[in-house]
Regions:
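Extended basic (Lys/Arg/His-rich) segments that typically form rRNA-contacting surfaces
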Residues: 1-205
Length: 205
């Protein structure tokens, strides 16, 4: 499975050939550097590790610097391993948007926006206990009863409650590639991609 590491640039709108307005996401992807090639004989499985984004050497560990020097490249901010990569590659090779085609469908994995600690209304879409009347107050966003008193006399595991929201790994499938600009390393896909501007993303072919 081929892929690339990139980051989210932002959103825009484009018209298709039929005049429909499409909400699109702009992604910057590549060029990625092959930082390691894993083989069945040496590592037990076949995979290619790609690196993306420049990191200053003073901010990298000695182990990381040595790892990237083997590939004759500078330290990278982000690395990712792609198993069963379609192309035959070796350390130091560069991979760009040429592996994708306009009109094809891709899968994107990224990190969703972190919302912090949120209540049940925002986190799970609860409607609240009800109107703030009949003697009630400050109950319009409350979760309500958590469980029965006699039966089951406990709170079930997995009950939806308040807690930390967002900041999760999210995979979005079947995003259509609308446009590719190889010179600027930009790709435009139809639809939304989780995360804020600058979020690192993994593109799967």
């Amino acid at each position: 499975m081929s892929g690339l590491i990139g980051k989210k640039v932002g959103m825009t709108s484009l018209y298709d050939t039929e005049g429909n307005l499409l909400g699109c996401t702009v992604l910057e992807a590549g060029p990625n550097v092959v930082t390691q090639v894993k083989t069945v004989e040496k590592d037990g499985y076949k995979a290619v590790q790609l690196g993306y984004g420049e990191r200053r050497e003073k901010n990298a560990t000695a182990a990381a610097i040595g790892h990237f020097k083997k590939a004759s490249t500078t330290p990278k901010v982000k690395t990712h391993e792609f198993k069963e990569f379609e192309e035959e590659l070796k350390q130091g090779d560069k991979v760009d948007l040429g592996i994708f085609e306009e009109g094809s469908y891709i899968t994107v994995t990224s990190t969703s926006k972190g919302k912090g600690f949120q209540g049940v209304v925002k986190r799970h879409g609860f409607s609240g206990v009800g109107e703030s009347t009949h003697g009630q107050h400050d109950r319009s966003r409350a979760p309500g009863s958590l469980g029965g008193s006699s039966t089951p006399s406990r709170v079930f595991k997995g009950l939806r409650m308040a807690g930390r929201t967002g900041g999760n790994k999210v995979t979005t499938e079947n995003l259509r590639v609308v446009k590719i600009d190889k010179e600027k390393n930009l790709m435009v896909v139809e639809g939304s991609v989780p995360g804020s501007k600058g979020t690192y993303v993994i593109l799967w072919k």
